[in-house]
Amino acid sequence: MAPFARFSLTCLAALLLAGTAQAGTQTLPIKQTVDVLPAEQYQQHLQQLRQQVRLAVTFAQAERARPAGRASVSLQPMFSAQAGSWPFEPFVNNGLFRAIAGYQAHHPQVVTLRGGSITLAQLHDALNDSRILKRYKDGYLLSYPLMIGADAGLVLEGTSLYLSSYSGTALINQGWLGLNKSNLESMAGDKAGNTDRAWRPFVIAWAGSHTQVVGSTLKRLGYNANLSRGLTTAISTQQPASSRPATVVIRDSQFSEMSSAVELQRSQATIEGSRFEQSQQYAIDVRDSQVSVRDNQLRGIDNNSGVRLRGQTRALVENNLILGAGKAAIEVSEQQGAVLLAGNRIGDSRGNGIQLRSLAPTPAAPLVIDNNLLGSSVGSAIDASEVGALALLGNHITNTPEYAVSLRNATPMAGPLLLSGNRLGQVGKAILRVEGMRQVELGGNSFDGKPLLQNLLIGDLLPLQGTLLESTVRQGNTVRVSQR
């Protein structure tokens, strides 16, 4: 008999009879048919689906060597609405210029790098001005905004760079920024800033740039304003639409006390083996990008989700530990492109474990949630609405007060919803709620419920509960439920 450890045959029979009785007393809003699928062919289909989605989200991360030669260093005025001002134009009204005005006694200036690469020690010697860059603790304290030109690079190697909050400091990258075994953090000091909001230094990397953070630490950067939340990538309206995406490589690093640790727009990014702690908004926020997020730990997101995927995004989110998100551990909303969420361990979310909203996956760009462990969320483990297709394969869901899986579409969608090989149970309500999905395929799942006290299947599947349990549990079949 297929796995169904917590249900005796007597209890199962009671559920079957209950399902039959309920079906007999309800008027079915739609006609539903149940077909048994050939087991071997179905397993081949699942294997092909896994291979297809893995291929769709896999990419070769673009790496870039730092620019050759020694960069030139200059101080340039920050005139808004002028030629060449677009890299800092978005920050005219966000507090940066007010913070600068409280420190610089003249028209705001930015340190500009051109035509090569430079280390912090070399930059210190070239500037020779402690008001701009001075030795501090185990590295240097920067008190001016710094702009890395498209042909330039800033190298942090085994050092620390402190960014002054009081003076209005930011790193604006059009070229190449690299941290290796280094520390980048804000320094507030004991002086109040000249701003009307909680302002902190940030890093912005524009389309065409490359940023890499390896074995390094970023701390206390960003505040909740556009393009200023931490380490952010974006494309400016002043850049050609054909500009190549910003590239980001983050490995074996730590991010803590950020507004949003990493906010990616129009990017290609690899984030591996890193820790994200005490983020205010999101740990990783992705839009219109290609991203691989693997083997990371995300702990303590105050207000929103751990990982958010939106827009034209292809994403692999795999083998991550995500604990204590303010909303969902992983949120996918209004997104197009293949997504694979695999092998993640998710718990203690103050919303849903995984939240899916307004998605229309296709056979070429599927949405697959595979082999994840989800538990102890305040809402449902997986909560989906207005989702056109979804595959849930081999997941273990337990200890949630709502539903193990809830999918609701106001307007019926074609599907399919695939549920195969999942272990689902110890939930407060029904294990599976499905509304508005024209095709549902079930098989090989095990259920840990409360016999006689709760339904396993509700929504559109409630009238068929007895039939489906008989076929999939007692007989071990995989079935397709079709609505007409």
Where are these regions (language model features)?
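Bacterial N-terminal signal peptides that target proteins for export
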Residues: 1-9
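Bacterial N-terminal signal peptides
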Residues: 8-18
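Beta-strand/loop edge motif enriched in small/polar residues
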Residues: 23-384, 392, 401-407, 414-419, ...
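Acidic, aromatic-lined catalytic clefts of primarily extracellular/periplasmic carbohydrate-active enzymes
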Residues: 388
